[in-house]
């Protein structure tokens, strides 16, 4: 299920103190984002099927940039003496100090969805395995599919997620890889903070400033939904392509009727489960295989209908 490679992750948890039924905390980003609701549902369904193996505590924050709120949740989980923390960090750098507190408290920490900044993690002298997809590869797949509908010299805009997050940066890089290979010009790059309304505002601004834009590449499907509304409001439906990333339920009818050309599925319902499975292995003292960079890669696929 998980891609295995050469290096084994170090195990730093105190096994002797682990109760028979470990408590695992799932800490996500905004539960206003359908992607994280799907992730939570998947984790709860898995726990129900494995209720004898662990207890699950799940939490999310009010919006995608609420690092203070997410920090408070992690601090509460430390006080609650959970055995493992599976976290999709709201910020790749700002969340590292509180994650170090969790590691120092003997909690097994697994990073999912958005990778913590490796340099900052290293500077804190901790090891936090990342369980998740190759975001750059996923975005490149979407971008390459879009490029086939365009021609060299066409102009496009990229609506990025929260710019301080690794997954936003990686998806932008993947989109750019595909556009550069096809000689398509990225004329605008702005952050939509992963959110529908902000994504729509950014899309409207791009369409107004660059009337020749032929496509909008959104770093997630929530922003793609906003972009679809902006395209319609600008009277450019059918003339400006929109692509996204996540394959949330809200995007599926738009893929069917052509309002959205493509997205990437990174299997939200399974992402937290991958992290939980890894945490349980470490808690039990089992060997967990990963790449040399501490990454356990999970699937990502192009979706066009």
How would you name each of these model-derived features?
Residues 84-104, 175, 187-188, 192-253:
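Hydrophobic alpha-helical
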